């Protein structure tokens, strides 16, 4: 094929002998002339050379390795002092493109395929040693590490069948690109996270150390990618977080697995996305859109993340052993996903601001109060032992057709911030409480600071002896089936509890409904099963309640049926003023 150029013609060899300059010459040639550059099998050692390629508006090209056999390796370069323009402390291994000054200049469409990258020779491996404690949580004060592949302002770049291993830093960055495709990429121990400053006194909430990041790019698609991280901090156990006094030693060292952030107008607002007319007026919708499909993340502070004017569609993804499985700080649709925190729940996170937000899925908005963000969780499965399956913060949230299963001291759904949510809709879910422990403040479902809550047609099954507590903000609790030991607590301005069924055949407990300083509460058309006639007075408690109505509820004591007319007066118990 006349369009195929052999990299070996430029002196590139797969024998481990440094040939970085030859690699640079070969790639520059193919970017200028077009075609496919075929790399030989074996270890292609770039030495201390770092590839920085910046050919604008050239022909399309392809960088192709021998499948499963071409490995790019690099000799160590020591960290440098971080500057204000870029957070990594070592130059990127391979950079294609650059920040353009005009929209019409960009890197043409290209494919990078069937190439492995290994940086085992990197000395900055993360985690301090005992003789470098003055440098904080890493061997040097400037230890965000490196970036394996940096793609900037490119038209339709495709990274396919890429494997990246042993990089202290980050894997792939797509910056201000259009229609990027990242497919079948696997990373092993590609991670970093300098949570502690060099003086050991300050902490960073936001840093580097990711597998894949799409930043300020239009229409990115990430599919069939996997990020495995087993890197942990290795340091003096006495070194602890100034924030929560948790030790760093042995804890996850990795920030984010896969995430997308920033709208395409981030940075220079005068530079439009390639082929897109993206208005930069402050009053227009500036959101970027991306898809993350069939991906897996293990061993990061955040498994997946959406942030800062992004709308991401996550489909059929799995998050295992991450402090937070999915962190949704903007808009997102999560569907058909699996989040498992059963093992990592036994570890507290030493990074500032994370512990209070923890959950399988964290719906929030850290950058400010913004209820315009739409957040959806559909047809997914979440398990937890200690933290909530779902954390609520801000925005408009829909949780539908999911299975949430908790053990020990975990919770199902909780509000974790003081910001106000516009609307929370929780419907048609299976909520399973399995072997929980009695604790001081159970509150397995707590939805507060919400303008309107719709909790409807859910099936809640409490398999334990301990009671499950529900505290739901203003709105409706309608047509749900509660099986097990339940206690409902209300402090709302308005609430409609209608058409629900409460029973506990296994433990024969009596449900409790407690209304404290509540207003405009309507309790109607519910079916309540109790198993002890003497408990009939212990069902509903009222304190400082105004406008409470009790209409057409059915109470069943074993096989005896009581209508509301015969027991209404004895059923309602008032205390306080």
Regions found by a protein language model. Name each.
Residues 1-24:
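Right-handed parallel beta-helix/beta-solenoid
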Residues 12, 115, 119-122, 166-168, ...:
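Glycine-centered low-complexity coil/loop motifs and glycine-rich tracts
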Residues 20, 24-62, 66-87, 117, ...:
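N-terminal extracellular ligand-recognition/capping segment immediately after the signal peptide
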Residues 37, 61-65, 94, 315-317, ...:
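Well-ordered beta-strand segments characteristic of repetitive beta-sheet solenoids
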Residues 38, 44-52, 70-76, 92-96, ...:
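Beta-strand-rich extracellular passenger or scaffold domains
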Residues 49-53, 77-103, 125-150, 166-173, ...:
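Extracellular beta-strand/beta-solenoid scaffold signature
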Residues 57-59, 108, 154-158, 176-181, ...:
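Short "repeat-start/strand-capping" segments in structured domains, especially the N-termini
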Residues 115, 162, 185, 225, ...:
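Consensus "Asn ladder" position of solenoid repeat domains
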């Amino acid at each position: 094929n006349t369009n195929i150029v052999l990299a070996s013609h430029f002196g590139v060899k797969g024998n481990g002998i440094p040939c970085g300059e030859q690699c640079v010459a070969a790639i520059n040639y193919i970017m200028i002339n077009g075609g496919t550059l075929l790399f030989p099998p074996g270890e292609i050692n770039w030495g201390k050379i770092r590839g920085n390629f910046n050919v604008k508006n050239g022909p399309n090209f392809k960088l192709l390795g021998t499948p499963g056999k071409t490995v790019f390796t690099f000799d160590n370069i020591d960290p440098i002092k971080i500057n204000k323009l870029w957070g990594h402390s070592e130059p990127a291994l391979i950079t294609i493109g650059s920040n353009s000054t005009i929209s019409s200049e960009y890197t043409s469409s290209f494919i990078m395929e069937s190439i492995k990258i290994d940086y085992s020779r990197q000395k900055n491996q993360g985690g301090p040693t005992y003789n470098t404690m003055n440098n904080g949580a890493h061997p040097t004060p400037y230890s965000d590490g490196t970036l394996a592949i940096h793609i900037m302002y490119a038209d339709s770049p495709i990274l396919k069948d890429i494997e990246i291993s042993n990089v202290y830093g980050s894997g792939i960055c797509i910056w201000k690109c259009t229609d990027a495709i990242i497919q079948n990429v696997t990373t092993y121990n590609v991670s970093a996270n300098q949570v502690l400053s060099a003086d050991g006194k300050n902490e960073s909430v936001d840093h580097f150390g990711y597998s894949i990041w799409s930043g300020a790019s239009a229409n990115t698609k990430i599919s069939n990618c996997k990020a495995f991280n087993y890197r942990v901090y290795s340091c003096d156990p006495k070194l602890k977080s100034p924030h929560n006094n948790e030790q760093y030693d042995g804890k996850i060292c990795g920030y984010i697995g896969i995430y997308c952030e920033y709208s395409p107008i981030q940075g220079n607002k005068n530079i439009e996305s390639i082929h897109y007319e993206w208005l930069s007026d402050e009053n227009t919708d500036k959101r970027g859109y991306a898809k993350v499909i069939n991906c897996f993340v293990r061993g990061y502070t955040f498994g997946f993340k959406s942030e800062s004017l992004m709308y991401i569609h996550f489909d059929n993804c799995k998050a295992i052993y991450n402090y937070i499985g999915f962190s949704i700080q903007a808009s997102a649709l999560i569907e058909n996903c699996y989040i498992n925190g059963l093992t990592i729940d036994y570890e507290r996170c030493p990074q500032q601001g994370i512990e209070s937000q923890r959950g399988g899925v964290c719906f929030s908005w850290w950058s400010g109060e913004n209820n315009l963000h739409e957040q959806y969780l559909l047809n997914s499965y979440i398990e937890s032992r200690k933290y909530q399956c779902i954390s609520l913060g801000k925005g408009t949230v829909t949780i539908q057709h999911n299975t949430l299963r908790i053990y020990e001291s975990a919770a199902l759904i909780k509000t974790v911030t003081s910001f106000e949510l516009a609307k929370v809709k929780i419907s048609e879910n299976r909520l399973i409480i399995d072997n929980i422990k009695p604790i001081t403040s159970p509150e397995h479902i707590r939805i507060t600071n919400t303008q309107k809550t719709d909790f409807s047609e859910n099936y809640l099954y409490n398999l334990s002896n301990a009671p499950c507590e529900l505290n739901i903000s203003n709105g409706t609790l309608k047509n749900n089936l509660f099986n097990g030991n339940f206690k409902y607590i209300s402090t709302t301005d308005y609430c409609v509890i209608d058409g629900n069924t409460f029973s506990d055949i296994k433990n024969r407990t009596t449900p409790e409904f407690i209304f404290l300083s509540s207003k405009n509460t309507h309790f109607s058309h519910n079916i309540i099963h109790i198993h002890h006639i003497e408990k009939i007075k212990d069902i509903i408690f009222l304190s400082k309640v105004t406008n409470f109505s009790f209409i057409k509820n059915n109470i069943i004591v074993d096989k005896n049926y009581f209508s509301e007319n015969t027991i209404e007066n004895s059923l309602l118990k008032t205390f306080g003023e």
